[in-house]
Amino acid sequence: MNPEYDYLFKLLLIGDSGVGKSCLLLRFADDTYTESYISTIGVDFKIRTIELDGKTIKLQIWDTAGQERFRTITSSYYRGAHGIIVVYDVTDRESYANVKQWLQEIDRYASENVNKLLVGNKSDLTTKKVVDNTTAKEFADSLGIPFLETSAKNATNVEQAFMTMAAEIKKRMGPGAASGGERPNLKIDSTPVKPAGGGCC
């Protein structure tokens, strides 16, 4: 057992391009935000260690690094994930409609008992909102997964989203399943990607 942490959880952020996945990651891991974030900057993952119920949990949070623009993310990305956060943009109805497709990807590639969380991002853009909170909540409830609206821009519920996911995974794994000793093989893809403009509130 590594003395630095009790658990190591691999989390994934998936969803359509431009919904703010990278901004959520930067807000949670570094507490930073930028309007001019390049969607394909190629951040593979960030790490943040949290305390939960007296346990030290190391979260390894993976971003799609722009792959989602091609609608398919390689199956290896899902391998070994403990939790997957599906993100849509509350001002973009299509990104919400595509949540079902992302959930199908999870069913196809991720482990059967992986924890899921639905996140509606950009909640600060209240005047542009087109996806109703109640609609999304009912959909998430029907699937038995937690749901939160977040804003990476003003940090609303960002901490809560990742803490909720960590708590759900910890609950599923039980007290005897500390994964601190498991070392997932890290394969960092260094393929250069073409930057594309666009912010991600």
UniProtKB/Swiss-Prot annotation:
A motif (Switch 1) lies at residues 30-45. The keyword Transcription does not apply. Residues 64-83 are annotated as: Switch 2 region. GO terms for biological process: autophagy; Golgi organization; protein transport. The gene is RAB1B. It comes from the Eukaryota. The modification Cysteine methyl ester is found at residue 201. Regulated by guanine nucleotide exchange factors (GEFs) which promote the exchange of bound GDP for free GTP. Regulated by GTPase activating proteins (GAPs) including TBC1D20 which increases the GTP hydrolysis activity. Inhibited by GDP dissociation inhibitors (GDIs). A motif (Switch 2) lies at residues 65-80. Interacts with MICAL1 and MICAL2. Interacts (in GTP-bound form) with MICALCL, MICAL1 and MILCAL3. Interacts with GDI1; the interaction requires the GDP-bound state. Interacts with CHM/REP1; the interaction requires the GDP-bound form and is necessary for prenylation by GGTase II. Interacts with RabGAP TBC1D20. Interacts (in GDP-bound form) with lipid phosphatase MTMR6 (via GRAM domain); the interaction regulates MTMR6 recruitment to the endoplasmic reticulum-Golgi intermediate compartment. Interacts (in GDP-bound form) with lipid phosphatase MTMR7. GO terms for cellular component: perinuclear region of cytoplasm; phagophore assembly site membrane. The small GTPases Rab are key regulators of intracellular membrane trafficking, from the formation of transport vesicles to their fusion with membranes. Rabs cycle between an inactive GDP-bound form and an active GTP-bound form that is able to recruit to membranes different set of downstream effectors directly responsible for vesicle formation, movement, tethering and fusion. Plays a role in the initial events of the autophagic vacuole development which take place at specialized regions of the endoplasmic reticulum. Gene3D superfamilies: P-loop containing nucleotide triphosphate hydrolases. GTP binds at residues 17-23, 33-36, 39-40, 66, 121-122, 124, 151-153. It is found in: Cytoplasm; Membrane; Preautophagosomal structure membrane; Cytoplasm, Perinuclear region. GO terms for molecular function: G protein activity; GTP binding. The lineage of its organism: Eukaryota, Metazoa, Chordata, Craniata, Vertebrata. Its cofactor is Mg(2+). Belongs to the small GTPase superfamily. Rab family. SMART domains: ARF (SM00177), RAB (SM00175), RAN (SM00176), RAS (SM00173), RHO (SM00174). This is Ras-related protein Rab-1B. A lipid is attached at residues 200-201 (S-geranylgeranyl cysteine). Switch 1, switch 2 and the interswitch regions are characteristic of Rab GTPases and mediate the interactions with Rab downstream effectors. The switch regions undergo conformational changes upon nucleotide binding which drives interaction with specific sets of effector proteins, with most effectors only binding to GTP-bound Rab. It comes from Macaca fascicularis (Crab-eating macaque). The modification N-acetylmethionine is found at residue 1. Pfam families: Ras (PF00071). It is a lipid-anchor.
